Amino acid sequence: VDSAKRENVPVLAYDRLVRNSDVDFYISFDNVKVGELQARYLLDRAPKGNYVLIGGSPTDNNARMFREGQMNVLTPAISRGDVHVVADQWAKDWLPSEALRHTENALTQAQNNVVAIVASNDSTAGGAIQALEEQGLAGKVFVSGQDADLAGCQRVVAGTQSMTVYKPIAPLASRGAEIAVSLARHEPLQPNGKVNNGFKDVPAILLEPIVVDKNNIVQTVIADGFVRLQDVFRNVPPDQWPKVAPKESGTRP
């Protein structure tokens, strides 16, 4: 970034905020909102009880923003005494094995008395759910996720993962390209927000993330072709597959 600025080249931070730097613009999904959606989904379904928080990589700024959003929602319930956080951990490099280890420890500490696990993405959700399976608790504890990856979507329809958060790639890529061209041409931009990166308030366009659960998975990630119905429901008996129109099956022409 410093080298580009010395040459008067504008810099766009694309989907990852560059900390403590003089970037000109930032585009991503509203990552604080992602965390809020995760926590709100779980809190609506488990308003009281013991919670486990599994964050992502502690060196990833996005992970910090997800946690900020999660705490925006959970803090009032914690203050009321409705929610008790029995473990608050970070998964190095977003590794499922880290989430597995942290969740195993949390379940031991809480004697399996856990109602919800706020996992910050689908890979950490997968590790947490593995720990739940070992205790016969999979599907009995609410678990969040994010990224709508195939394994996460499979767990959603299987009922072991409660939800995921979908961030459509197409609008991010197209808007990012438009912004890059406008920056190169020194054309004015219309941000819809700003994010402080430790050096400055960076003007930003923050796109809306989408909550996905078993009730809308066909109409969202499958309809968009992000994942295919036959892949998502691979582990579900065919007679239990949803009846959908061809355009909703996720099969591209």
Where on the chain are the PLM-derived regions?
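A residue-level marker of the well-folded mature domains of exported/periplasmic proteins
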Residues: V1-P253
